């Protein structure tokens, strides 16, 4: 299983993009939640509220998901990165694979 993490400016955008990725069957599901972020941007420290999302997919869909997320993302320089999960309940992995077919 592959987890793709990204942040968004607000709940609406996180849910909108999550829905589009579901409709394209690039992900089986996603989780979105409010976060507080601190980061450097254009020479200044910024602290802000954002929304994060974790998108769940298969290794076969990872590249296509990454490219589509980059295309849809509203940020100039979005945080988008993947994590490979080694141990997944077999039944869950079967459901995930079936969901992105």
UniProtKB/Swiss-Prot annotation:
Name a single GO biological process.
response to metal ion
Q: Where in the cell is it found?
A: Cytoplasm
* Cytoplasm listed as a keyword: yes
Chief localization: cytoplasm
Record-given protein name: Divalent-cation tolerance protein CutA
**InterPro entries in UniProt:** CutA_tolerance (IPR053426), Ion_tolerance_CutA (IPR004323), N-reg_PII-like_a/b (IPR011322), N-reg_PII/ATP_PRibTrfase_C (IPR015867)
Query: Has UniProt tagged this entry with the keyword Repeat?
Result: no
Q: What Pfam families does the annotation carry? A: CutA1
Question: Of which family is this protein a member?
Answer: Belongs to the CutA family.
What's the stated role of this polypeptide?
Involved in resistance toward heavy metals.
SUPFAM superfamilies reported for this sequence: GlnB-like
